[in-house]
Swiss-Prot record:
<feature type="active site" description="Charge relay system">
    <location>
        <position position="707"/>
    </location>
</feature>
<dbReference type="GO" id="GO:0042802">
    <property type="term" value="F:identical protein binding"/>
</dbReference>
<keyword id="KW-0597">Phosphoprotein</keyword>
<dbReference type="GO" id="GO:0004252">
    <property type="term" value="F:serine-type endopeptidase activity"/>
</dbReference>
<feature type="modified residue" description="Phosphoserine">
    <location>
        <position position="185"/>
    </location>
</feature>
<dbReference type="InterPro" id="IPR029058">
    <property type="entry name" value="AB_hydrolase_fold"/>
</dbReference>
<dbReference type="InterPro" id="IPR045550">
    <property type="entry name" value="AARE_N"/>
</dbReference>
<dbReference type="Pfam" id="PF00326">
    <property type="entry name" value="Peptidase_S9"/>
</dbReference>
<comment type="subunit">
    <text>Homotetramer.</text>
</comment>
<dbReference type="GO" id="GO:0050435">
    <property type="term" value="P:amyloid-beta metabolic process"/>
</dbReference>
<dbReference type="InterPro" id="IPR002471">
    <property type="entry name" value="Pept_S9_AS"/>
</dbReference>
<keyword id="KW-0378">Hydrolase</keyword>
<dbReference type="InterPro" id="IPR011042">
    <property type="entry name" value="6-blade_b-propeller_TolB-like"/>
</dbReference>
<feature type="modified residue" description="N-acetylmethionine; alternate">
    <location>
        <position position="1"/>
    </location>
</feature>
<keyword id="KW-0963">Cytoplasm</keyword>
<comment type="similarity">
    <text>Belongs to the peptidase S9C family.</text>
</comment>
<keyword id="KW-0007">Acetylation</keyword>
């Protein structure tokens, strides 16, 4: 039997972390053009991009690796790597041209200070760099957006132009008392006159530019930019409505214009990261006349428009606006030539039996269409696993491509000419890279997957999914008969199960979910001898829209009781050590952790909370998501809303700060000083309240970290401190 790492051995825990943190994560994949060999065979290259933690450099490194896939048109004959991995430094975005003969790369270079960094747009062809444009020196716009909310890098169908999104060039500003430099080369008559630089606006040095919140702090006014590759000329497109911010753009059929998503930014911007409910619509701007046309319903929220291979139709995801941040979405289809919009897949109120429970992905892959432009492939959470699906856009029929396969979760990276590139993982298996052809309509369940990169299972981890039904007194009257699930990881064959401690992890959001995929922290804790319980309480995504809608107005109550019920059920059935149960959660998971130690103080011996929501009322005026505070408390949100005393009272009543007098569990707080989502003063408020009551508490403040605490230095330090906290308060 494999030896478990004991709680009393932090050095071994550090060594274990060093080993498991080397597991890389897939971030992107693209398929090269189809090549015919001299013998008539067909093959394609698969270019993959990965990220990996580097503890020596304390950063996430990026690298690429290529593979060859030989096929006969509808099945893979042979597949394997074509060389070793190579680190890619400075690449922000890259995109193959439609023919596959060229590649565009957005690269940063220069100093480590942000003001010294320059951005270059490169065009590569075969074995040479064909063009390189210093975008920073050209001064047509500000920094290019490389994020997946607004950012894009799109080739025109003619492969002569590149489309991207950048920050609008800001006017120069100066003090009212700015001294002008004199031109010493001028004539005597000109000596007394100052030089004439670009006209600067006096007194605008400190004008506030509102940004898009968490992880988007430097992004305020995006503009659409077009680079003419031959001439090097850059144009900032006119015609975009003044009240929207453009992004996720691509070329319209025939290169006649540009299609983009426009997000409303009036009267002010709300945080957009992790929020699919921001009011937005699909637009088309004509390049010849600059006329802009609205293509979708302007009262909703949309994202991920994707043009079909035949350039006739566009699919996109559509959500209700200013409601819960993430919900079940519609898949909509816009016909370019008839101008008709239809709903292909509608919102699913609740899952019936083993049927489809709805679409919950926040983005469609850039490549998601079948070769015949009839079907769309995507991944989505279905209860506590993530599967791949194909939907027929004509009939709306949905078929799972992976439900009949191994337990675990899938992610679609791309599909092109029906060749799919996907990732598969489980809680005990790091990500594997697989390829397979999309079968003909009606036979979608018969995909034959071939591994390009197979990961080794992590021994010593046993996992499963528990279905839980709330007791009658905890039913939601409006949304009755909802169940929920929890994923349980536990050490394989422990010497004495009654001595196994348990860490309970509720997820954040609250409208997100855990799926049966690889996660570093739960795997690490399980290897150290803990059972780990990941709870998808009612309100989680993947269980139908009714489950999501059951939670707003009931936070701090329904979700808390669901987690506690799951804990009690698992302790009763598995006989783990009930005296050694700990909580670990971030954001809304931290909110629940702090609630649980206040409402059920006898159950938990330690608590670790990362950037937790502590006081909804005090967070309302400082967060980038004030709508969250209103909606989750149970009130409608509008940009002009002013909470009254009743609203403030409800916010306090649903906050963990209410239960401070009952708390006796030792608490470790981990806060990111740059967190715009749940400002670190939330955790400070809890810290001071606990200190005043002599409850054991420790606070770690990471000065350069934001809400996710995902930087390598913060993540590694927070994990080791969590291990030490568990060792101290649970014992070995």
């Amino acid at each position: 039997m494999e030896r478990q790492v004991l709680l009393s051995e932090p050095q071994e825990a550090a060594a274990l972390y060093r080993g498991l943190s080397r597991q890389p994560s897939l971030s992107a994949a693209c398929l090269g053009p189809e090549v015919t060999t001299q013998y008539g065979g067909l093959y394609r290259t698969v270019h993959t991009e990965w990220t990996q933690r580097d503890l020596e450099r304390m950063e996430n490194i990026r690298f690429c690796r290529q593979y060859l896939v030989f096929h006969d048109g509808d099945s893979v004959v042979f597949a394997g790597p074509a060389g070793n991995s190579v680190e890619t430094r400075g690449e922000l975005l890259s995109r193959e041209s439609p023919s596959g003969t060229m590649k565009a790369v957005l690269r940063k270079a220069g100093g480590t200070v942000s003001g010294e960094e320059k951005q270059f747009l490169e065009v590569w062809e075969k074995n040479r760099k064909l063009k390189s444009f210093n975008l920073s020196a050209l001064e047509k716009h500000g920094p290019v957006y490389e994020d997946d909310c607004f950012g894009c890098l799109s080739w025109s169908h003619s492969e002569t132009h590149l489309l991207y999104v950048a920050e609008k060039k800001r006017p120069k500003a100066e003090s009212f008392f700015q001294t002008k430099a004199l031109d010493i080369s001028a004539s005597d008559d000109e000596m007394a006159r100052p030089k004439k630089p670009d006209q600067a606006i006096k007194g605008d040095q400190f004008v506030f530019y509102e940004d898009w919140g968490e992880t988007m702090v430097s992004k305020s006014i995006p503009v659409l930019c077009v680079l003419d590759i031959d001439s090097g000329n850059i144009s900032v497109l006119e015609g975009v409505p003044e009240n929207v911010s453009p992004g996720q753009a691509f070329w319209a059929p025939g290169d006649t214009g540009v299609v983009f998503v426009g997000w409303w930014h009036e009267p002010f911007r709300l945080g957009i990261r992790y929020c699919t409910n921001r009011r937005s619509a699909l637009y088309y701007v004509d390049l010849s006349g600059g006329k802009c046309e609205l293509l979708s319903d302007g009262s909703l929220a949309i994202c991920s428009p994707r043009l079909s291979p035949d350039q006739c139709r566009i699919v996109y995801l559509q959500y209700p606006c200013l409601a819960p941040h993430h919900q079940c979405s519609q898949l909509c289809l816009y016909d370019w030539y008839t101008k008709v919009t239809s709903v292909v897949v509608d919102i699913v109120p609740r899952q019936l039996g083993e049927s489809f429970s709805g679409i919950y992905c926040s983005l469609l892959p850039l490549g998601c269409w079948s070769a015949d432009s009839q079907r769309v492939v995507f991944d989505s959470a279905q209860r506590s696993r993530q599967d791949l699906f194909a939907v027929d856009t004509q009939t709306g029929s949905i078929t799972s491509l992976t439900a009949a396969g191994s337990a675990g979760s899938w992610k679609l990276l791309t599909i092109d000419k029906d060749l799919m590139v996907a990732q598969f993982s489980t809680p005990s298996l790091p990500p594997s890279l697989k390829v397979g052809f999309l079968p003909p309509p009606g036979k979608e369940q018969s995909v034959s997957w071939v591994s390009l990169e197979e990961a080794e299972p992590i021994p010593g981890i046993h996992w499963g999914v528990r279905v839980l039904h709330p007791p009658p007194d905890q039913e939601n009257v409006q949304y009755a008969d909802l169940d929920f699930e929890a994923i349980l990881l536990q050490p394989s064959n422990p010497p004495d199960k009654t001595q196994v401690p348990m860490v309970v992890m509720p997820h954040g959001g609250p409208h997100s979910s855990f799926v049966t995929a690889w996660m570093l922290f739960p795997a690490m804790l399980c290897k150290m001898g803990f059972a780990v319980l990941l709870v998808n309480y009612r309100g989680s995504t993947g269980f139908g829209q009714d489950s999501i809608l059951s939670l707003p107005g009931n936070v701090g109550h329904q979700d808390v009781k669901d987690v506690q019920f799951a804990v009690e059920q698992v302790l009763q059935e598995e006989h783990f050590d009930a005296r050694r149960v700990a909580l670990m959660g971030g954001s809304h998971g931290g909110f629940l952790s702090c609630h649980l130690i206040g409402q059920y103080p006898e159950t938990y011996s330690a608590c670790i909370a990362r950037n937790p929501v502590i006081n909804i009322a005090s967070m309302m005026g400082s967060t980038d998501i004030p709508d969250w505070c209103m909606v989750e408390t149970g009130f409608p949100y509008s940009n002009s809303c002013l909470p009254d005393l009743n609203v403030w009272e409800e916010m306090l009543d649903k906050s963990p700060i209410k239960y401070i007098p009952q708390v006796k569990t030792p608490v470790l707080l981990m806060l990111g000083q740059e967190d715009r989502r749940v400002p670190f003063k939330q955790g400070m408020e809890y810290y001071r309240a606990l200190k005043a009551r002599n409850v054991p508490v420790r606070l770690l403040l990471y000065p350069k970290s934001n809400h996710a605490l995902s930087e390598v230095e913060a993540e590694s330090d927070s994990f080791m401190n969590a291990v030490l906290w568990l060792h101290t308060h649970l014992g070995s």
